[in-house]
Structures are given as C-alpha cells and as structure tokens.
C-alpha cells in the first residue's frame, strides 16, 4: 500500500527528518546535503511517497542489479516538492550505491535558479494521490557507478526530453539505452563510459542525426 508522509521544511535542519520518513536503503547524507544546498528554504513541504516503482530504475535492476552478489531492492520512493501548496515537481530516490541515490527528477526550474536563463522545457506529468500534476521541466538524474554512467545519463536526458515533446523521436528508459549501446570489444555492464561514436550510434536508434 502506498503511503505519504509530510515533512515541513522550516530550516535546513528540517531535511534531516527525511531520515525517519524514507527507508534507510534509499537515503544517505549525500541526499540530505544536496537537498539542503539546492532546495534550501525555497520549498516549505516535502511529501514522501513510498513505495514507488520507477520504470527507469527497474530497467537497470533487471539487467544489472538483480545479477549482483549483493542484494538490491526494487522499491524506490518519491519526494514531492511543494511551496505554499504549489507543486514544483519530484525527486526519485533509488536503492543504489551511496552518492548515487538520486534518480529520475523533474523540478520546476524557478525552484533552483534566480537569474535569467534560456531553458529547454516541456510539460511532464506526475500522478500524486490520484491527481495528475504538470511539471514544466527538463529531465535530470544522477549517474550510477557501473551501469548508467555519464554518457548514458546524458543520452537519457536527451531522449526523455525529445521523446516526450516531439512525435518524431523515441523515448527510452536508461536500461533500454544500455541494452542498445553497441560494444564490439567488451561487455556492456559494468561500464566505464562511452566513446563519441558509441553515443552517436546510440542516438541514431532514436531518430537523431548526430554530428561528431
């Protein structure tokens, strides 16, 4: 059964209350410090949704984490960010290695920046307690250590943005991107990164026309 816990943000120390609301395998001090640094007091409430089945994490779980000696869980959680009852998006927390637990994230940029900027944005949907919420955002996620490293994650943000905004492009989970990566000289996971040619070939699978 899905539950929601409400955390009021009155000071930076309020973020420490998340450690009592989020399962220990999904949160560490890296998460707390990032929230304090980037969100700070720009939000006044976080609603913790647990459990949450994240399609992107599950796509890597079945092809990688489930085959590891150390057991990894399937369940994630979402942190829904609000200020004065206005919805600003969500952050997914996943049971990966310390320092990599922040997964798929959609946040309204006004929450993070104050200066003028040109941004590529699209309306993404989130279902929260039966309500469909709209988030004008650009997709983001932190990289993992051995399956979705920097280049995979960059390709994911591109395909997720263009695949949702334009019909001519295909969306993909991070696991699908890993599976579709050409690698004639070794295994796909664990991965140390991708070459420019690999990234170009990967994006071609999703109707892009890269130029190196």
Predicted regions and their residues:
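Proline-rich intrinsically disordered, low-complexity coils
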Residues: 23, 51, 71, 95-98, ...
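Conserved active-site-adjacent core of cysteine acyl-enzyme catalytic domains
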Residues: 1-69, 178-212
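Proteins with a high burden of low-complexity, intrinsically disordered sequence enriched in S/T/G/P/A and R
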Residues: 84, 98-101, 161-163, 208, ...
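Active-site nucleophile-adjacent alpha helix/oxyanion-hole segment immediately C-terminal to the catalytic cysteine
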Residues: 117-187
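Non-catalytic propeptide/linker segments at domain boundaries
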Residues: 75-136
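Context-gated lysine
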Residues: 5, 10, 19, 33, ...
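Intrinsically disordered, low-complexity regions
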Residues: 41, 74, 90, 100, ...
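Weak global preference for isoleucine
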Residues: 2, 7-9, 27, 32, ...
């Amino acid at each position: 059964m899905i539950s929601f816990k409400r955390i009021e943000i009155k000071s930076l120390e309020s973020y420490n209350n998340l450690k009592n609301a989020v399962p220990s395998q999904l949160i560490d001090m890296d998460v707390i410090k990032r929230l304090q640094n980037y969100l700070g007091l720009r939000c006044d409430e976080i609603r913790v949704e647990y459990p949450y089945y994240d399609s992107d994490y599950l796509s890597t779980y079945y092809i990688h984490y489930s085959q590891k000696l150390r057991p990894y869980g399937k369940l994630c959680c979402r942190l829904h960010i609000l200020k004065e009852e206005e919805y600003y998006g969500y952050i997914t927390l996943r049971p990966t290695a310390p320092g990599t637990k922040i997964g798929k994230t959609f946040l309204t940029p006004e929450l993070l920046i104050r200066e003028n900027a040109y941004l590529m944005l699209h309306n993404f949907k989130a279902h929260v307690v039966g309500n469909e919420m709209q988030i004008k955002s650009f997709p983001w996620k932190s990289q993992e250590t051995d399956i979705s490293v920097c280049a995979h994650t960059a390709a994911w943000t591109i395909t997720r943005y263009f695949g949702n905004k334009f019909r001519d492009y295909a969306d993909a989970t991070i696991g699908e991107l890993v599976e579709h990566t050409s690698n004639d000289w070794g295994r796909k996971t664990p991965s140390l990164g991708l070459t420019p040619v690999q990234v170009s070939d990967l994006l071609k699978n999703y109707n892009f026309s890269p130029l190196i």
